[in-house]
Each structure stands twice: as structure tokens, then as C-alpha cells.
Swiss-Prot record:
Keywords: Cell membrane, Hydrogen ion transport, Ion transport, Membrane, Transmembrane, Transmembrane helix, Transport
Protein name from the UniProt record: A-type ATP synthase subunit I
Protein family (similarity comment): Belongs to the V-ATPase 116 kDa subunit family.
PANTHER family: V-TYPE PROTON ATPASE SUBUNIT A, VACUOLAR PROTON ATPASES
One Gene Ontology biological process: vacuolar acidification
Annotated TM spans: 376-396, 415-435, 460-480, 489-509, 518-538, 542-562, 568-588, 590-610
Organism: Pyrococcus horikoshii (strain ATCC 700860 / DSM 12428 / JCM 9974 / NBRC 100139 / OT-3)
Gene symbol of the encoding locus: atpI
Subunit structure: Has multiple subunits with at least A(3), B(3), C, D, E, F, H, I and proteolipid K(x).
Length: 659
């Protein structure tokens, strides 16, 4: 807690024949972050033919999965599935090496791929035929405006026939220009259809190029005349029936596709996951160095997992391995990957810290402080017992439903569960139960503070909380800088603000505490002098401008905590409006039917659910902002390098490694 997980560096050199099994072992336990070995004049490892095949088969399997996915029955989904998702069962695979795995995949694909490709090809063919028939049907519907049999619209040995559409305003000049170009050797049938005009242009074969040139000039859209004989309107039922037959044929093929998906989809996903993980392993081979008989790797490993890693390496290699374990050097500190370490009941708040950025290896992890202050700020802004209870119930259900998955939803729900406790507690202190609903119902509610009637007091409390929050940040910054040897920064950039905040606090409390003015002014003055010296040392000629800018920046950050009061008032205000609206319509009756009461109950429940949602969203965003902008700005950079282990991603598969 407060410090990241202790990380050590492991360097391994062993025989090349152990490479595949060793990489697979490290990939499956997922506790080591592989790094590129920092040696320039050395040969790098490269993917062999089996890893290249894994990449190719990963792509092939992905396409086959996408093909069959469309034939699966629709997922149940819905609210229940979101709240209580089912964990996918995992199928075991005995891993005997990548060569054996590739052979198994090839055998599987030889059996499955032709059938799926055939299905895909057949569906594509039928869809193309249906599309072609629909185009023909559309053409017939247009041509049915002419009382001309289709065989006369195709032309012949001596005559050329062009049938198509043109914008109505272009029809007249088009007809005139064609007639002029071919010197009247043309016959044109015209039929206006709304804003378009249907034209049949009959010309001599020898004039076809001249006619085509004019038609193109006016944007003539040619219509392909369908096969068959008779009037277009007589052919429409025939083509409609053909489309129905093709759609029936397509449905039969899709029915077969559903059976194929039922047989093979799960296996495809299983082998795809196996290939995806082999593909990822292959991508890391360039991190390794090798000779003709040996290879070397470098990894960062949490200290608590070192024993497991070393035991696995020794077991796989039979002890034929050089293993060097060392702590990060001073030069490596900034490059050490950071894994946050907090008690289980705080670990879910790491998600909020990581959203901003992890600390450097030698910096403080703000998660424990953020866990309390974030939940408190959230509760202060939402500040209603019933709203907190509703949020807590939903969060508890999500925590239970996602407990096996331990996914992002589970972490977020745990954060909201903590926040709901603070919301209910502060709701009791402020006497807020759906706003003033109980007061309006004639029930006297005890409260320490009413944000609607004592807004100025709530504002003073919010600013006091903000000052304490900023003080904590500067104090943490002072500790980190002093410990890391940056004493100048600790004094001029952190201690200066600590003294200024102490001076402001003593000034505000001087009348109650009886602190002499000399002490108050002395502490504030020393802080201000240190701050100004720090600005001069850091910015030289620009110091005068930046002193003013940075000081008022601090004041702005402090005043930003007024949003605690503002959102608390907003929550109470929205709840008050809902309650007044319910009171206004409650007494309405129509023929002795208490319609107002029925509508009032709906408005009361729906309104407060909406108020909970909108105000919880505001509390979530603004509580984050107070940490990311105001609090972290005092001491925290978030410029660390997150620990990203070399780890398999498994949802449906599980490896049993044979060494």
C-alpha cells in the first residue's frame, strides 16, 4: 500500500530446445513482463515456420468464426445477462509443443474448412442471383409504364435500341440534339414518370456511337432489358416467383448453416484462441537473443512471483539454465514497469488510478487515499440516503453477478458500492431521503445540516475539505521529492505551498484558536517567499508573470472544490422539484378515481430514479475531476510505465503443458 509492487529483473540463458516450452510456461502463468534484451551486436530470434503458420491459421480461423457467427441463434442478452453473466466453460488441451498443435489445427481445418467455404460460396451465389433478379424486377416495373413487349426493346441487326431514364427537364433538349445529330434517322418513345422521363431511342446501328455520346452527355441511365417475351407487366409475376424460389433455397442453405455452426462453432473458437496465443508468443521472439545452441531472455517479475518463475524454469530445463536475479539499478528506475499493490478491499480503486496513469517505480501510489476521498466526494455530491441505497443495491447485484469474471464491471461496481455507503451516510447527516420527501409527508427528519437552507455553511465546509485535500497532495509530493533526493524541489515547490495552506488555515481559525497574527503572517510569509524564490530559480526572467499565474492557479484549484456544494445543492434541488410536482398532482380526482395519486406515484418513482442516475453521473465525473486535475496536480505525474505481463488470454481454452 502506497508503494507499487516490488519488481526484480530476471535474466535467463538456456538451450534453444527449451525455448518453446519455456515461453509457453511463462505465457500461461502470466506474471513476467518480457523485455527486449539490450544487446546490439547479437543475433535476434525470429519466428520459425510453425509460428508463421500460427499467424496464418489465426486469420483463417477468425474468418471461419465470423462466417458461422451469423448462423448462431440470437443471444439471450438483456438485463439479466448483463447483471448475472455466465462464465464460459473451458476446454483443456494437452500442449506437446507448437509443432503438435499446428498439426492438430491442420487436421481440424482439413475436416471443417471445405464445408464452411462451400456453405459461404453457396450463400454468396444465391444472394447474387437474388440481387440480379431484384434488379430485373425493378427494371420491369419501370418498363411496365410502356405498353411495349420486351422483345421489341432489344434491337436487332440493323437497329439499335436504348432504353433508360433521364431527368425530366433534360428530356426535350436531349431528344432535339439526337434528332439533329443523326439527321432525323431516329424514333423516340417518351413517357414522363414523376421527375424522371423514360425514353426508348431507336436508331440505326451505324448511328449508335453518335447516339450514345449524346445520351452520356445528358446523364442517361440505361436500363438493361430483361430476357423473355411479352409485356413487362406480364413478366413481373414470373420474376417475383423466381425471387421467392431463390429465397426459399437461401433459407434451406442457412438452415444447413445453422447445423454446421452448431457442430463446429465452439471448436473453431477454441482453436482460434489457441492460435491467437501462439501468434502473440511469436511476436515476442524478437525480444530474445540467440546463438546456435542457446537463447537468452530478460523479464521483469514481481518479487512475490520469483520463486514460481525460477522453479518452472528449472523444471523445464532440468536445471540446465543460467538465472540471474537483480534489483533495478538507479539508471533503470524510470523504466521499471509498475504494478500497483493494495489490499483486496482497495484494489478495485486501482482502475481509477490507472485511467490517469500509474506512478513511477519510486513514487507514491495515491490509490489508498483516492479510495477514501473519491468515495467521500461522490457521497457529498449525491448526498441522499435513498439514492445511495438504490445505487448500493444495483452495485451489490453487479458485484455478485460478476464475481467469477472479476472484469471491469465488477471493479466499477465495487467502487460504486463503497461510494453508495458514503452517499447513505451523508444523506442521513443532511437528512435527505428523496430530497425533502419525508418532510413534505409530515415526518420530522433529524439532520445536522440542510444544504438548501445552509448553502453558505456547506460552501465553507467544501472549501475546507478542498484545502485539506490540496495539503495532503503537497505533503505527499514533499515526501516523495525529499526521499528521491530532490530537496530543492521539495522545499520550493511543495513546502512553500504547505506553509501557505497552514497560514490560510490559521488565519481562518485565528479568532477561535487565538493564534497571534505574527505567527500566522510569519508562516504564510515564509511560504510565499519560498514560492517566489522557487519561481525565480525555475523561470528566471518570466518569474514575475508566472508567480501571479501560479498563485491564482492555486486559488482557482482551491475554489474548484466549491463544486462539492454545487452538486449537493443540485441533487437537493432536482429532488425538491420532483416532490413539489408530485404534491401538485396528488389530489387530482376524476369521478372519485384518485388519478392524481396513481400518476403521482409514477412521477415520484420515475423522477427519483432519473434524479439518481443524472446526479450519480455528475458525482462520478466531478469527483474524478477533483482528483485528476486539482489533487494529482500537486504531486502526481502518472508517467510511470504500467506492468503488462506476457500472459495468455484464455476464455474457452486451458493448457496442460507436457514438459
Amino acid at each position: 500500500m502506497f508503494k507499487p509492487e516490488k519488481i526484480v529483473k530476471i535474466e535467463v540463458i538456456t538451450l534453444t530446445r527449451f525455448r518453446d516450452t519455456l515461453l509457453t510456461y511463462l505465457h500461461e502463468i502470466g506474471v513476467a513482463q518480457l523485455e527486449e534484451v539490450p544487446i546490439k551486436e547479437v543475433q535476434r530470434d525470429t519466428p520459425n515456420e510453425f509460428y508463421r503458420k500460427a499467424t496464418s491459421y489465426s486469420i483463417t480461423l477468425s474468418r471461419l468464426v465470423d462466417t458461422l457467427k451469423q448462423y448462431l441463434p440470437p443471444k439471450k442478452g438483456g438485463f439479466k445477462e448483463f447483471m448475472f453473466p455466465q462464465e464460459k466453460p473451458k476446454k483443456k488441451y494437452k500442449y506437446k509443443g507448437i509443432e503438435a498443435l499446428i498439426k492438430d489445427v491442420e487436421t481440424f481445418l482439413e475436416r471443417v474448412e471445405p464445408e464452411i467455404r462451400s456453405l459461404e460460396s453457396e450463400v454468396s451465389r444465391i444472394n447474387n442471383e437474388i440481387s440480379s433478379l431484384e434488379d430485373t424486377l425493378e427494371s420491369l416495373q419501370i418498363l411496365s409504364n410502356l405498353n411495349v413487349e420486351v422483345e421489341y426493346l432489344r434491337g436487332g441487326s440493323f437497329l439499335n435500341v436504348d432504353v433508360g431514364l433521364v431527368d425530366r427537364e433534360k428530356a426535350e433538349p436531349l431528344i432535339k440534339e439526337i434528332s439533329d445529330v443523326v439527321e432525323g434517322r431516329v424514333h423516340i418513345v417518351r413517357k414522363d414518370i414523376g421527375a424522371r422521363t423514360l425514353l426508348v431511342v431507336v436508331s440505326l446501328r451505324e448511328d449508335s456511337s453518335k447516339v450514345s455520346s449524346v445520351l452520356a452527355k445528358y446523364g442517361f441511365e440505361k436500363i438493361e432489358v430483361p430476357e423473355g417475351k411479352g409485356l413487362p407487366r406480364d413478366l413481373i409475376p414470373i420474376y417475383t416467383e423466381k425471387i421467392k424460389e431463390k429465397e426459399k433455397e437461401l433459407e434451406e442453405v442457412k438452415s444447413r448453416g445453422r447445423k454446421v455452426a452448431e457442430r463446429y462453432y465452439d471448436e473453431l473458437v477454441f482453436y482460434k484462441e489457441l492460435m491467437d496465443n501462439e501468434r502473440e508468443k511469436g511476436n515476442y521472439l524478437s525480444y530474445l537473443v540467440r546463438t546456435e545452441m542457446t537463447f537468452g531472455l530478460l523479464a521483469w517479475v514481481p518479487e512475490k512471483d520469483v520463486e514460481k518463475v525460477v522453479e518452472g524454469i528449472k523444471k523445464i530445463t532440468g536445471g540446465v539454465a543460467y538465472i540471474n536475479i537483480s534489483e533495478p539499478s538507479k539508471e533503470e528506475i524510470d523504466n521499471v514497469p509498475v504494478k500497483l499493490k493494495n489490499p483486496e478491499f482497495l484494489s478495485h480503486f486501482e482502475m481509477l488510478t490507472e485511467m490517469y496513469g500509474v506512478p513511477k517505480y519510486n513514487e507514491i501510489d495515491p490509490t489508498p487515499i483516492m479510495a477514501f476521498t473519491y468515495s467521500f466526494f461522490f457521497g457529498f455530491m449525491l448526498t441522499d440516503f435513498v439514492y445511495g441505497l438504490l445505487l448500493g443495491i444495483i452495485s451489490a447485484l453487479l458485484v455478485k453477478g460478476h464475481s467469477k469474471l472479476k472484469d471491469g464491471t465488477w471493479k466499477f461496481a465495487k467502487i460504486m458500492l463503497w461510494s453508495s455507503v458514503f452517499t447513505m451516510t451523508l444523506g442521513i447527516l443532511f437528512g435527505s431521503y428523496c430530497g425533502n420527501a419525508l418532510d413534505m409527508a409530515g415526518i420530522k427528519v433529524p439532520r445536522i445540516l440542510d444544504p438548501m437552507e445552509q448553502a453558505l455553511t456547506v460552501l465553507m465546509i467544501a472549501l475546507a475539505i478542498g484545502l485539506a485535500h490540496l495539503f495532503t497532495g503537497y505533503l505527499l509530493g514533499f515526501i516523495v521529492r525529499w526521499k528521491n533526493g530532490d530537496k530543492k524541489g521539495a522545499i520550493f515547490e511543495q513546502l512553500s505551498w504547505l506553509l501557505i495552506i497552514i497560514g490560510i488555515t490559521l488565519f481562518a481559525l485565528s479568532s477561535r484558536l487565538g493564534v497571534p497574527d505574527l505567527i500566522v503572517k510569519g508562516i504564510f510569509g515564509i511560504g510565499l517567499i519560498l514560492f517566489m524564490i522557487g519561481e525565480v530559480l525555475a523561470n528566471k526572467g518570466m518569474a514575475v508573470l508566472l508567480v501571479i499565474s501560479d498563485f491564482f492557479g492555486f486559488v482557482g484549484n482551491w475554489l474548484s472544490y466549491a463544486r462539492l456544494m454545487a452538486l449537493a445543492l443540485a441533487t437537493s434541488g432536482i429532488a425538491l422539484v420532483i416532490n413539489i410536482l408530485v404534491e401538485m398532482i396528488w389530489g387530482i380526482k376524476i369521478a372519485s378515481v384518485p388519478l392524481g395519486a396513481l400518476i403521482g406515484i409514477l412521477v415520484l418513482i420515475g423522477g427519483h430514479i432519473f434524479s439518481t442516475a443524472i446526479n450519480a453521473l455528475g458525482a462520478f465525473v466531478h469527483a474524478l475531476r477533483l482528483h485528476y486535475v486539482e489533487f494529482f496536480g500537486t504531486f502526481y505525474s502518472g508517467e510511470g510505465r504500467k506492468f503488462e505481463p506476457f500472459a495468455a488470454k484464455r476464455e474457452v481454452s486451458e493448457l496442460e503443458i507436457e514438459t
